[in-house]
């Protein structure tokens, strides 16, 4: 499993070419908190919407704790996406280590 820590992602987001962020959580979860500029594709819609992603882009997937996004990362790798990472610990770890102002749930 190729994962990226919250601190590594924070650093990558300030790069000239940041990764594409994809939030795989449910709609209600995105209303509580989310990362700026993330594309929201709920896990159950992924098969129908995968064409919205470029297989050549660096993609970082996230969810609440990293479990659902890990499953989607494996799915994308199986489709030939080369640079796919899962946010280790999801937004829960992000809120504890990078952004303590983010709402936790």
Give residue ranges: language-model regions.
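Short, surface-exposed ligand- or partner-binding patches at beta-edge/loop junctions that are enriched
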Residues: 62-63
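Rhodanese-like catalytic fold shared by cysteine-dependent sulfurtransferases
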Residues: 1-20, 24-58, 67-105
């Amino acid at each position: 499993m190729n994962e990226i820590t919250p601190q590594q992602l924070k650093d990558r987001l300030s790069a000239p070419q940041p990764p594409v962020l994809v939030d795989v959580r449910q709609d209600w979860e995105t209303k509580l908190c989310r990362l700026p500029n993330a594309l929201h594709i709920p896990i159950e819609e992924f098969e129908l919407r995968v064409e919205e992603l470029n297989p050549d882009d660096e993609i970082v997937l996230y969810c609440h704790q990293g479990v659902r996004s890990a499953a989607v990362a494996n799915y994308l790798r199986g489709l030939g996406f080369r640079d796919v990472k899962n946010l280790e610990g999801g937004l829960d770890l992000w809120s504890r280590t990078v952004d303590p102002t983010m709402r936790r749930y």
